[in-house]
């Protein structure tokens, strides 16, 4: 079957932004103008096409990136059809994982900014992620009709906060309730959209006289940026003072794809102005799959190889999202990087080294779906029927092994105990949590060996709230959650040479007799528990030695200070005595347990607390505040670096986990939400005396 659209007319783009910049509304308008949706969905009415999970419609925020396919022939209907795949990405900080994941499979992005709020904190995070994956991007300043809208203020903020190089290719005509349209700086014409046709119709006109000088100034700025694409153009520009429309577009395209500039436009998606021109810019300036370097990967011997975006190449694809669909069950969204895939094919999951059979292939139009028979290089679609594939896995031709680069997922930073409200739901809850963990790699589930409770861990409080909420909605499991907890440990600091334990019961009949002498010493951190049998001359008979070790091991689970597990100790059994009749395993087990407890009390016991490696990315103005706050949380600041590409500082510190609860909220308020942080477990370290005292007091029987 021949390819419907040549690959150079493909655009795989993301629309990403801060939480209220109007991103979902912008996506909705894109779908309306490209003819997918005939009735516009509004986020605030809870009916937007891409927000298809119930919670998203209720909360008015986008949680999962739906991949939508549409076709565009240009605002003036003068282009051949272009195939656009749009990944709608969430803007909330607890869902950054979704944004990372979609950035990985995009070729370009549209950054949507609010004309009033400008460059907000989450926009900075998303910008850094786009830098990380070197994604070319456009900027669309939305909500130009709102009170306080200011296009040029956003331009300045992009330069100052993002260290970006924005190049306006339009300027607004008016603002707030006087926002009528835009000046197209390439054609030097005004564009006014017709309200009655919901913006489907528009006309070019002359630039209003009062805007002419301003438009000239910004056109010059744009032509200069275009001229910098090559020496040849620069010479022509210096000689003639201008460039042709085709030259400007081609040069801006080259520089956008090289991540040197960000073409900037404006409009109001809600009032149907500007989105059509943004779609034209996606085609004019963002790359097709063949405009960017071929995808790198590793072969079986871990040597680097590449896969070209061509139908004739061997098949390779990356799974970037798992979702559960109410009708077909589990969907796996994949981006095909090379070759072709037909339904019914058998492919290799090269990460898990398992074969997978492709059931149906469906292309999503938000939550409607169209079945397709094959997908080719550049396509994004969802596959039904995969058994072992999870997010980040590579699928490839089973005769041409490749692992495309893995996505790196952050470790969860917050954990809570969760239990079903009724015993009957226990099994259902386990199933639900495992299904949710398969969809979301930043969410983990485990069973706590000490308490037997189910512990869920994730990227933040909102993240876990939504997980609990989804259990209730999608799986009908109501659960109660506990307070976030810290896992402390205990150990000793001194060696005790001779610790005696004697268990004797002799009151008529069969007695009990066990007697051991132990040496207890601290081990270096992370060594764990070690038991040494140094008995000479049979003072403790062979058959009782395992019972002695068992007695010590059982006592390890609950330390003498506050009942936390004991780690990093070495116990040597070197002497003891026994009774021919009364000695048995139980007596020796009890004697060992008593000796060990006694020894721990005498060997300077301490409590160890988990230390976290914390990284805060913050604008420079707040670096002092952030460092001060980390120090007040008993943190050790270990260094400060520049953020790659400018735009702030990365502060690295080691902070006790117990001091990090509520940190997201306090960091948000201390930096007006402009800083982000990540943390992961580093090691256990001795808690200071005042902290130990507080823990011991809180654990003491009341």
From Swiss-Prot:
Superkingdom: Bacteria
Record key words, sorted: Cytoplasm, Elongation factor, GTP-binding, Nucleotide-binding, Protein biosynthesis
GO molecular-function terms, A-Z: GTP binding; GTPase activity; guanosine tetraphosphate binding; translation elongation factor activity
GO cellular component: cytoplasm
UniProt xrefs under Gene3D superfamilies: 3.30.230.10, 3.30.70.240, Elongation Factor G (Translational Gtpase), domain 3, P-loop containing nucleotide triphosphate hydrolases, Translation factors
UniProt key word Cytoplasm: yes
Keyword presence, Cytoplasm: yes
Entry's localization field: Cytoplasm
GO BP term (any one): ribosome disassembly
SMART domains according to UniProt: EFG_C (SM00838), EFG_IV (SM00889)
One Pfam family hit: EFG_III
Ranges of residues in domain tr-type G: 8-290
Binding site for GTP: 17-24, 88-92, 142-145
Classification via NCBIfam families: EF-G, PRK12740.1-3, PRK12740.1-5, small_GTP
Function noted in UniProt: Catalyzes the GTP-dependent ribosomal translocation step during translation elongation. During this step, the ribosome changes from the pre-translocational (PRE) to the post-translocational (POST) state as the newly formed A-site-bound peptidyl-tRNA and P-site-bound deacylated tRNA move to the P and E sites, respectively. Catalyzes the coordinated movement of the two tRNA molecules, the mRNA and conformational changes in the ribosome.
Cross-referenced HAMAP family: EF_G_EF_2_B
Family: Belongs to the TRAFAC class translation factor GTPase superfamily. Classic translation factor GTPase family. EF-G/EF-2 subfamily.
Protein name according to UniProt: Elongation factor G
Species name: Herminiimonas arsenicoxydans
Gene: fusA
